[in-house]
A protein has these predicted regions:
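Short linear loop/turn motifs
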Residues: 61-71, 137-142, 233-236
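Protease-associated
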Residues: 128-193
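Beta-strand/loop-dominated core regions that host nucleotide or nucleotide-derived cofactor-binding catalytic loops
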Residues: 97, 118-121, 125-136, 171-173, ...
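Feature captures the catalytic cores and cofactor-binding loops of soluble hydro-lyases/lyases
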Residues: 46, 168-250
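A signal for specific C-terminal beta-sheet/loop modules enriched in small/flexible residues
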Residues: 131-133, 203-223, 304-308, 315, ...
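Short, basic, glycine/proline-bearing loop/turn elements
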Residues: 71-79, 159-161, 179-185, 203-204, ...
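Low-complexity, flexible helical/coil segments
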Residues: 71-76, 139-145, 151-156, 202, ...
Length: 328
């Protein structure tokens, strides 16, 4: 429940401080709402003496009642690590929690903002793969994850990443092979002869779909990473492209981010001049805590305040016009 601040006047004297503390304590004792005593200036020596005499801490000091980003009902989608796969990122975008959110943040290893990801970035990447079949430096762990696969030749020297042109091997003569050398990722089915040729060519990776690999091929000394998957060749070929890290797909340029302490008036001016649909929100340590969109700014939740020991706006907390006055 959002707190209700109880404040006296500016340049507070002892009456103003004690009135705020007493009224907040009374309301907390008889009700279910959270009342917080607050002050609008420094504690005088006299007031501090009174507080010390009866064992009370001074009320929290507030500077303004202007609406801040922290007061908005902003979205809190799960932030994605830049190291997760595009496949997992897509699943996150399609989750119930994120379906209505235009974009979700991508973070670095420290939880700081790295980029923003929306379905349009994934769609754009997907279209690029139609004209460029090559992939570079896919972590083997990611590939195993998206293919639901397992390595069949763990005894060989295997790299941590794989690169190359992706091709589905079809039965054909050796001289007409579509792949050659280590710069290839080859997908085969129940084709032991084609699998043997791929291993002899020392391709970067051999993916065996819905088939068993002959034992002699498993025992061959090779640098080829051999992976078995329950997927068919077409699905395996598509999933390879979704194994790359989402940090290589997300938008990293022209990022607009706001902090929890930013005022909504200032945020609104920036948003109205921008074409982005979703904006990351950062805390005081620059960690991602959520996102906001234009509709969050339409009717922001106002801070609530009770005025004691005064009733003039000129003596009240700055930004009072943006607050909801609960009582005077």
């Amino acid at each position: 429940m959002e707190p209700i601040y109880v404040t006296g006047h500016r340049n507070p004297d002892t009456d103003s401080i004690v009135s705020a503390m007493a009224y907040a304590a009374l309301q907390n004792a008889i009700g279910e709402r959270d009342y917080v005593p607050a002050r609008l200036g420094h504690i005088s020596d006299e007031t501090q003496l009174v507080l010390d005499r009866f064992g009370f801490e001074p009320p929290v000091r507030i500077q303004t009642m202007r609406t801040q980003v922290r007061d908005l009902d902003y979205d809190t989608p799960p932030a994605l690590s830049g190291a997760v796969t595009v496949s997992r990122a897509w699943a996150a975008l399609q989750s119930n929690k994120a379906k209505s959110i235009p974009a979700i943040p991508v973070t670095n290893e420290n939880g700081e903002l790295y980029g923003m990801l929306s379905p349009s970035e994934i769609a754009s990447y997907d279209m690029r793969t139609l004209s460029d079949s090559r992939v570079d430096k896919i972590p083997v762990f990611n590939l195993l994850s998206v293919l639901d696969g397992k390595i069949l030749n763990e005894s060989g020297y295997l790299a941590d990443t794989i690169s190359g042109e992706v091709s589905i091997a079809l039965p054909q003569n050796n001289e007409n092979l579509l792949f050659k050398g280590p710069d290839a990722i080859v997908i085969v089915g129940e084709q032991p002869e084609m699998a043997r040729r791929a291993v002899e060519q020392q391709v970067s990776c051999l993916i065996v779909c819905q088939a068993e690999l002959p034992e002699q091929l498993r025992q061959m000394q090779t640098n080829t990473c051999i992976i078995a998957t329950p997927f068919d060749a077409y699905k395996a070929a598509r999933m390879i492209y979704y194994a790359i890290e989402v940090a290589r797909v997300c938008r990293t340029d022209d990022l607009e981010a706001f902090h929890l302490t930013d005022f909504v008036d200032d945020v609104r001016e920036v948003v109205l001049k921008s074409r982005h649909r979703s904006y990351p929100i950062l805390d005081e340590n620059d960690k991602v805590v959520g996102t906001l969109s234009r509709y969050h700014l339409i009717k922001p939740r106002r801070k609530r305040v009770v005025l004691v020991d005064h009733n003039e706006a000129a003596q009240a907390v700055p930004g009072l016009e943006q607050a909801e006055i609960v009582e005077i």
